[in-house]
Amino acid sequence: MSERAPVVTVDGPSGAGKGTISQLLAERLGYKLLDSGAIYRVLALAAIHHNVELDNEESLTLLAAHLDVQFVTGNEGKGIKVVLEGEDVSTTIRSQECSNAASKVAAFPRVREALLRRQRAFAEAPGLIADGRDMGTVVFPATPAKLYLTATAEERAQRRYNQLQDKGFDVNIDQLLSEIKERDDRDMNRSVAPLVPAEDALIIDTTNINIEDVLDLALTHIHQKLQVPA
């Protein structure tokens, strides 16, 4: 396939820093941003709202085909606003319930196929930062600029704990760690689009690296691969 605009893919497990780096890259390069994980979270939330069982692939696929979701940018560095059926669900979809449900619905091949075309449609000028789990391996495999961020499960659990605490959610870090390990196992071993780095991706372990250094590594890679101005 050929992308209609420059695309940078940022893949990796939950809590590795994909969201933060993707937003910083979009701001630095002036590119649009796609939070692929949000699409699955929105679908999971829509399923909950419409009383669709999370193990019903046929109903989920039908819901995905008609999913009314928009990503509204321009929030002055505060990320994108996720809108489902006219309602701002940016905070709601970040709950642990939606996070776990999203991983479940994403495991269905027909659901992923239904959302694949919509994700690719986000590749528009001047460029796109695509944040997800299979952006470089499935959605935008032709782009030369691929990143894969990772970190230890313990570090990712701590980051998730801090994030949810800041948003006012009551969470238990041991439970978060257990859920992250379970999700890693589920995502890495599923039959369709398992969570693995693209062969040509730059792998960055963010466990002991500050965000500025991660950003520098990412920008250097992007400049080399896309030949965009530094």
Swiss-Prot record:
Query: Entry's SUPFAM superfamilies?
Result: P-loop containing nucleoside triphosphate hydrolases (SSF52540)
What are the entry keywords? ATP-binding, Cytoplasm, Kinase, Nucleotide-binding, Transferase
An example of a Gene Ontology cellular component annotation for this protein is: cytosol
Q: Which InterPro entries match?
A: Cytidylate_kin, Cytidylate_kinase_dom, P-loop_NTPase
Which Pfam families is this protein grouped with? Cytidylate_kin
**GO biological process annotation, one example:** nucleobase-containing small molecule interconversion
Q: What domain of life does the native source organism fall in?
A: Bacteria
Swiss-Prot/TrEMBL catalytic activity: CMP + ATP = CDP + ADP; dCMP + ATP = dCDP + ADP
- Transferase is among the record's keywords: yes
Kindly list the positions annotated as binding ATP: 12-20
| Protein EC | 2.7.4.25
**Which Gene Ontology MF annotations are present?**
ATP binding; CMP kinase activity; dCMP kinase activity
Coarse class of the protein's main subcellular location: cytoplasm
Q: Where in the cell is it found?
A: Cytoplasm
Q: Does the keyword Transferase apply?
A: yes
Instruction: State the similarity comment.
Output: Belongs to the cytidylate kinase family. Type 1 subfamily.
PANTHER family listed in its UniProt record: CYTIDYLATE KINASE, CYTIDYLATE KINASE/PANTOATE-BETA-ALANINE LIGASE
Q: Know the name of this protein?
A: Cytidylate kinase
- Coding gene? cmk
